[in-house]
């Protein structure tokens, strides 16, 4: 993986998920590849990466320090904010998956609603399906998995046998 990421001529931030071995991921990190939560602030938007990984736990958790960094940024800036997480912040409508979203999601949601004049776009993985929902000034997206997809709105574990692997392209302009 490190060799593949080194082909890029820009810095890469990787976000660990619940299946990742954090120690192994740290071995590929250097000046170009980082696990750190980085803020790429470049008007007219700002990009924040939140590490929701909790070792040996399927559910995610937001780091309060990262939330405070976002709050500090919002107190001084009005640009669009893009946030990347592994675990989704809201439920996606599949009962068995919805039990494993970010535990302290309300902290982030309340902060974003407080800054109602700011547009937020949150992109998450974990759920192996594409999902979109808008709540006031916040757009929530989940990204399909690069392997198999889970059936949308299923009450129990179910692989979608029709959809193949996927990904999401996000163009920042």
Regions found by a protein language model. Give the residues of each.
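Acidic/histidine-rich helix-loop elements
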Residues: 21-32, 55-64, 151-161
